[in-house]
């Protein structure tokens, strides 16, 4: 299974998925969201019934994925697609980088009271061996500096800074 654009790049893809397609399997139904940036064939699965999105390496709690194959513009547009999901959508990402991402956000968004509160919650969860995932679209819009970037230039600068952080 994979994005239709990867059919010639990845051998043996048996199910080709398209942006906006509704994919059904057993009792699950999800919308495919094409989100190039981290890779050229990256997709997210948005599960309507559960109000949950699996973002892989596109969006993390308080961060976003590195650009391995895609461009800044592609990642910026992909994040904007995810931002359009309902505010109470739960986000399940591909890696647990929340604490390190929180340090970067705090260094570049020093007056964000929502972020300060979230960092305390993150530390409390981790101290109690609890996961910091899922987060929600609402929380990420309030605290994730990459989602708060309102233009491509700002986003690109932040992504470069994070790569060196």
Report each predicted region and the residues it spans:
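Active-site neighborhood of phospho(di)ester-bond hydrolases with catalytic His/Asp-centered motifs
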Residues: 1-5, 33-37, 54-56, 90-94
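Active-site HxH/HxHxD metal-binding segment of metal-dependent hydrolases
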Residues: 1-31, 121-125
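Active-site metal-binding loops of divalent metal-dependent hydrolases
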Residues: 7, 38-39, 51, 58-59, ...
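Divalent metal-coordination and catalytic microenvironments
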Residues: 17, 35-38, 57, 75, ...
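Core dinuclear metal-dependent hydrolase active-site scaffold
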Residues: 20-48, 52-53, 84
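Active-site-flanking alpha-helical
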Residues: 44-45, 64, 102
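Active-site-adjacent loop/tail segments of enzyme domains
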Residues: 63-89
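Accessory terminal helices/loops
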Residues: 80-90, 99-165
């Amino acid at each position: 299974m994979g994005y239709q654009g990867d059919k010639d790049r990845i051998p043996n893809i048996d199910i080709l998925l398209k942006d906006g397609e509704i994919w059904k399997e057993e009792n699950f139904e999800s919308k495919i969201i094409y989100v190039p940036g981290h890779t050229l064939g990256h997709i997210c699965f948005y599960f309507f019934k559960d109000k949950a999105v699996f973002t892989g390496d596109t969006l993390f709690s308080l961060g976003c994925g590195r650009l391995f194959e895609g461009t800044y513009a592609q990642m910026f547009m992909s994040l904007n697609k995810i931002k359009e999901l309902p505010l109470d959508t739960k986000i399940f990402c591909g890696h647990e980088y929340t604490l390190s991402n929180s340090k970067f956000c705090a260094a570049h968004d020093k007056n964000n009271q929502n972020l300060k509160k979230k960092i305390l919650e993150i530390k409390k969860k981790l101290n109690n061996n609890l996961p910091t995932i899922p987060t929600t679209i609402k929380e990420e819009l309030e605290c994730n500096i990459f989602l708060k970037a309102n233009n491509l230039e700002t986003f690109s600068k932040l992504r470069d800074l994070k790569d060196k952080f």
